[in-house]
């Protein structure tokens, strides 16, 4: 498709950005992106796009990789019957070549590509064709990334063609060719064998099957031939959750997918062995399990828990709140006053007096948040997974507690939820991302934003994105009113710090520093353009109360100089940047000749 231009400069300088070829018959030029990540945009962006009759962008990944394109800006003249200007995507080429006149897999114009939309190639080549008439438009901008195909390999043993057996404690299975759309007429089976003392939990991460497809889950007992249908998924269903102590067989029949091009499914499978239930010896002391299958929200009081209602002895009680795999748990204390003898000092340690501790599940282990005693009430708590455990330890007897005139004990409200409880932030929530919020100036020119569970402790192992989209002539100001992010120094991995990072790109931006600690950034944070991204990342070690900020889209005067910034990889030396500039000017010179 793209041929190397016979030019001395191109022969001497390694190609960092791409190269042009002159097709004498069809007058198409081609730019090759042969690095693993970077940014792309319409010619001369942010200057208007016009008068580009035929230009190809060829994205080439290493072998056994695929290409992902992500758009953050897309605005061409609108479709009036047909597109006067458009981009066409060819996502299935095996060698980077297409035939003249070959029909594209996708054609877009107007505002038909929303911000954040992603496209995947089937193999290592992805071709994007630009065709622009005389009518000017804003153009487009995005990022590309080469991804190893092995990232989408099912955690299962392939017994025959598209027939798998799951043998791991926890596994993820993918539909054929995911994240590319699955082929038509394919039939696949996934066998999850029974394990004594375990239940199998099936939870969908992605569920997008076409109208002609069907996914069925059958239950059977090992050693027996009969099976029972327990779940049937069609195109209208976007999620599944199934648990069983028997063997499971997942059967997928694709039907025809040539037109609809559904991407299929990503399903998480896990053997759950009642880790959180107690042995008869310990369970007899005090154990309370609250499951979201029965109660999505409710209240709890310490004087209603287990042996606290009758025992006169010191004891401890575990309260386990467990939801579905896609749920989180929030806890808010409405009363907290634990008994403390007059001769005890609880300013430093709570272990010698009545206390309450909280743990959350991180991976396969429980991680302690903190412990509280006296009248120091816990902050609002939120888990990042589907399990949160409280443990109430009493050193005092019931008689001593009741002898006081104080209201001894605690009361709390709990809630199971699938979102981050941030609906009041007036942001658009990306359902395909775990924690992504978008702010568009067409809806609100200013507003507030905050960390999950603010003003309580933010969850652990969190990665949240706050995306800002303004008009062409707008930038974004962000000003922090409250800032408490656990960390210090450079806020990097060596200090095990949580952090906030700002970026003007969708890919990783090393030019912007991280922020953490208790000191907010000085003055407002200002974006370079109308697109801005704020990242909030937490680890699984420590906690803090997060941040509260306000944002505003501000209209600026248009620059007298049109500046173009081309970024292909995350790092370039001054030497390579110098030759890149020479190369770009050479391309323009060649283009003018032809």
Curated annotation (Swiss-Prot):
This chain belongs to the protein called Suppressor of lurcher protein 1
The residues on the Extracellular side of the membrane are 24-571
Q: List residues of the CUB domain.
A: 28-147, 162-272, 286-417, 435-554
Q: Which cysteines are joined by disulfide bonds?
A: 83-109, 162-188, 286-317, 435-464
Q: What is the effect of changing residue 323 to R?
A: In ak66; induces delayed reaction times; when exposed to a drop of hyperosmotic solution
Residues spanning the signal sequence: 1-23
Positions annotated with a glycan in the UniProt record:
34, 151, 187, 345, 355, 440
Q: Where are the transmembrane segments?
A: 572-592
> What does the entry list under GO cellular component?
ionotropic glutamate receptor complex; neuron projection membrane; plasma membrane; postsynaptic membrane; synapse
How does this protein sit in the membrane? Single-pass type I membrane protein
In terms of SUPFAM superfamilies, this protein maps to: Spermadhesin, CUB domain
| Entry comment describing in which tissues the protein is expressed | Widely expressed in the nervous system. Also expressed in neurons that do not express glr-1.
Protein location: Postsynaptic cell membrane; Synapse
Q: Does the keyword ATP-binding apply?
A: no
Does Glycoprotein appear among the keywords? yes
Keyword field: Cell membrane, Disulfide bond, Glycoprotein, Membrane, Postsynaptic cell membrane, Repeat, Signal, Synapse, Transmembrane, Transmembrane helix
> What's this protein's function?
Accessory protein required for glutamate-gated currents. May participate in the gating of non-NMDA (N-methyl-D-aspartate) ionotropic glutamate receptors such as glr-1.
A Gene Ontology annotation in the biological process aspect, one of them, is: thigmotaxis
Topology, Cytoplasmic side: 593-594
| Organism lineage | Eukaryota, Metazoa, Ecdysozoa, Nematoda, Chromadorea
One Pfam family for this entry, by name?
Answer: CUB
Q: What is its main location?
A: membrane
> GO molecular function terms here?
channel regulator activity
Q: How does it assemble?
A: Interacts with glr-1.
Q: Which gene does this sequence derive from?
A: sol-1
């Amino acid at each position: 498709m793209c041929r190397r231009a016979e030019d001395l400069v191109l022969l001497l300088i390694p190609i960092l950005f791409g190269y042009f070829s002159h097709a004498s018959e069809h007058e198409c030029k081609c730019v090759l992106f042969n690095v693993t990540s970077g940014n792309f945009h319409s010619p001369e962006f942010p200057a208007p796009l016009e008068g580009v009759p035929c230009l190809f962008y060829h994205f080439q990944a290493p072998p056994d990789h695929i290409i992902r394109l992500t758009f953050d800006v897309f605005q061409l003249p609108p479709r009036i019957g047909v597109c006067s200007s458009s981009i066409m995507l060819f996502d299935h080429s095996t060698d980077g070549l297409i035939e003249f006149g070959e029909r594209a897999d996708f054609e877009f114009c107007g505002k038909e590509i929303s911000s954040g939309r992603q496209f995947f190639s089937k193999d290592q080549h992805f071709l994007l064709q630009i065709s622009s008439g005389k009518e000017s438009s804003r153009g487009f901008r995005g990022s590309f990334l080469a991804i190893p195909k092995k990232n989408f390999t099912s955690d299962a043993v392939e017994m025959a063609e598209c027939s798998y057996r799951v043998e791991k404690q926890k596994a993820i299975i993918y539909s054929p060719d995911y994240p590319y759309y699955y082929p038509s007429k394919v039939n696949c089976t996934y066998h999850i064998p029974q394990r004594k003392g375990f239940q199998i939990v099936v939870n969908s991460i992605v569920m997008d099957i076409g109208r002609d497809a069907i996914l069925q889950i059958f239950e059977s007992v090992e050693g027996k031939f009969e099976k029972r249908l327990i779940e049937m998924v069609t195109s209208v269903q976007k999620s599944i959750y199934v648990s069983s102590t028997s063997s499971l067989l997942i059967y997928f029949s694709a039907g025809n997918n040539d037109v609809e091009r559904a991407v299929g499914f990503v399903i998480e499978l896990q053997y759950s062995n009642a880790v959180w239930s107690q042995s008869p010896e310990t369970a007899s002391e005090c154990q309370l399990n609250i499951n979201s299958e029965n109660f999505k929200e409710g209240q709890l009081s310490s004087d209603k828990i287990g042996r606290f209602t009758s025992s006169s002895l010191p004891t401890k009680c575990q309260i386990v709140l467990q939801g579905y795999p896609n749920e989180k748990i929030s806890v808010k204390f409405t009363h907290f006053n634990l008994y403390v003898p007059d001769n005890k000092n609880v300013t430093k340690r709570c272990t010698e007096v009545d206390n309450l501790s909280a743990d959350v599940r991180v991976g396969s282990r429980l991680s302690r948040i903190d412990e509280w005693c006296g009248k120091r009430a816990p902050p609002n708590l939120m888990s990042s997974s589907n399990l949160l455990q409280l443990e109430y330890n009493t050193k005092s007897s019931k008689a001593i507690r009741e002898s006081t005139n104080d209201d001894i004990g605690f009361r709390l409200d709990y809630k199971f939820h699938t979102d981050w409880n941030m609906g009041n932030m007036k942001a658009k929530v990306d359902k395909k991302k775990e924690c992504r919020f978008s702010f568009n100036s067409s809806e609100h020119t200013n507003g507030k934003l905050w960390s999950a569970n603010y003003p309580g402790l933010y969850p652990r192992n969190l990665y949240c994105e706050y995306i800002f989209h303004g008009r062409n002539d707008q930038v974004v100001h962000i000003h922090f009113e409250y800032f408490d992010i656990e960390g210090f120094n450079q806020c990097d991995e060596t200090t095990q710090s949580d952090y906030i990072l700002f970026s003007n790109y969708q890919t990783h931006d090393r030019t912007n520093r991280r922020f953490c600690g208790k000191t907010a950034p000085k003055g407002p944070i200002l974006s370079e353009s109308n697109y801005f991204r704020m990242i909030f990342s937490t680890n699984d070690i420590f906690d803090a109360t997060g941040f509260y900020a306000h944002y505003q889209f501000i209209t600026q005067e248009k620059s007298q100089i049109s500046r173009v910034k081309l970024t292909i990889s995350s790092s370039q030396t001054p030497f390579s940047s110098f030759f890149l500039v020479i190369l770009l000017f050479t391309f323009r010179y060649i283009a003018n000749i032809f």
